[in-house]
């Protein structure tokens, strides 16, 4: 029997579908806030806010997670890297508004992303209360490594020929697909919730208007990068059959029709959720 894998996106087409039913049939890879509702076998995130949210939630102590530029630094360097010339009085006054972190405990390593503390404090001092209200847009995010630690940097993945690292700057969904191909080498990959487009004039995401996500009133995210990145993956792995799962395949909207840019790839096909149910007797 062909080795199957399920790659879960966060498009609204999967709303109401029980992902747990897939578990007996293959590994489940997901991205970003999927963990809030369902624990995949592996999770990938590429944006600072959601990466640190995932780590602070303890997910990396349960399953492998892959993050962008996830560089672990010895704990002894923390104070000097954080303060970087800022005086103690200023740090104490503003740090609580700026720093997002988990508990340090006895951690021996940490990962830090975000703005420069000195720069943020200078900005607050210059613009006063108005700027202090907006410091959430300029924060420092720190994750202290906890054991067991199953977090990895996407950069450390095997690069393709001509590439220096395993991170191509892709979005989270296609990045999770690449991680899955390297780690599992499936013969069939089912793309569930990778809607790419929207059913209407608003953003299509299960987690819209929640922390680290765009407001529900915003317009759709342009699909051009997702389409190009998945297309690259199809080209790199011609012996794997990719199946995009839609609610229907009747052309009622952009979500439920073939992707024109993928028409030259022979290893991508389309199916609906009822076909998926029948195929795996879900």
Segments predicted by a language model, with ranges:
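Metal-ion/cofactor- or nucleotide/acyl-coenzyme-handling active-site neighborhoods
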Residues: 1-282
């Amino acid at each position: 029997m062909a080795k199957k894998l399920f790659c879960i996106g966060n498009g609204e087409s999967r709303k109401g579908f029980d992902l747990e039913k897939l578990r007996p049939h293959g590994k489940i890879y997901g991205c970003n806030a999927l963990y809030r509702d369902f624990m995949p076998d592996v999770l990938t995130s590429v944006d600072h806010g959601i990466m640190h949210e995932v780590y602070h939630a303890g997910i990396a102590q349960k399953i492998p997670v892959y993050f962008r530029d996830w560089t672990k630094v010895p704990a002894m360097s923390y104070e000097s890297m954080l303060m970087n010339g800022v005086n103690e009085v200023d740090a104490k006054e503003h740090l609580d508004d700026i720093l997002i972190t988990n508990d340090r405990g006895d951690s021996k390593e940490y990962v830090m992303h975000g703005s420069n503390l000195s720069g943020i404090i200078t900005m607050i001092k210059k613009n006063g209360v108005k700027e202090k209200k907006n410091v959430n847009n300029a924060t420092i995010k720190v994750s202290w490594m906890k054991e067991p630690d199953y977090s990895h940097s996407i950069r450390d993945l095997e690069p393709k020929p001509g590439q220096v690292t395993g991170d191509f700057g892709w979005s989270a969904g296609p990045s999770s697909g690449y991680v899955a191909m390297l780690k599992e080498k499936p013969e069939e990959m089912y793309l569930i919730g990778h809607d790419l487009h929207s059913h209407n004039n608003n953003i299509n995401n299960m987690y819209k208007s929640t922390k680290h996500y765009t407001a529900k009133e915003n317009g759709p995210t342009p699909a051009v990068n997702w389409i190009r990145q998945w297309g690259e993956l199809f080209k790199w792995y011609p012996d794997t059959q990719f199946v995009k799962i839609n609610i229907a395949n009747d052309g009622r909207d952009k979500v439920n029709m073939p992707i024109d840019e993928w028409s030259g790839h022979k290893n991508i096909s389309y199916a609906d959720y009822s076909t998926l149910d029948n195929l795996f007797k879900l």
